A protein has these predicted regions:
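RNase III-family endoribonuclease catalytic core
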Residues: 2-123
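Short, intrinsically disordered, charge-balanced linker/junction segments flanking boundaries
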Residues: 126-129
Length: 129
């Protein structure tokens, strides 16, 4: 069995009155969210980027380019599920995902398990920490 590890990073500008999505869940009490072509879920996007890199299948921009209207306003979970399908079609299996969020807000501690469950569900049950 071949095991590969990928690293992904994603950055979006914060904008007031834009809904915050992080880790495939909504954060309705946040005053600002990440703007972008899709839902701006930087955690889901960085995870997609890492998985694509590990499998040698390109990067987030190649697979979900902003010129493709199919991905306009797409959720982080939709992107993760599509990446899972791409990986599976190319003979790859996700063993686990480990991700870090570097931000002052939102405070994810109380919703960590919810994020892990939502992302794991989008990735076909692969463990997420």
């Amino acid at each position: 069995m071949t095991i590969r590890i990928g690293t992904g990073v994603d950055v979006h500008p914060l904008e007031v009155n834009v809904p915050m999505h992080l880790g495939c869940i909504a954060w309705p009490n946040e005053p600002a969210g990440c703007s972008g072509h899709s839902d701006g879920d930087v955690l889901a996007h960085a995870t997609c980027d890492a998985l694509l890199a590990a499998a040698g299948l390109g990067d987030l921009g190649e697979v979900f380019g902003t010129a493709d209207p199919q991905w306009a306003n797409a959720s982080g979970s939709a992107l993760l599920t599509h990446v899972l399908q791409l990986l599976s079609a190319n003979g790859w299996k996700i063993i686990n995902v480990s991700a870090q969020v570097i931000a002052n807000s939102p405070k994810i501690g109380t919703r960590r398990a919810e994020i892990q469950q939502a992302m794991s569900s989008a990735l076909g049950g692969a463990p997420v920490s």
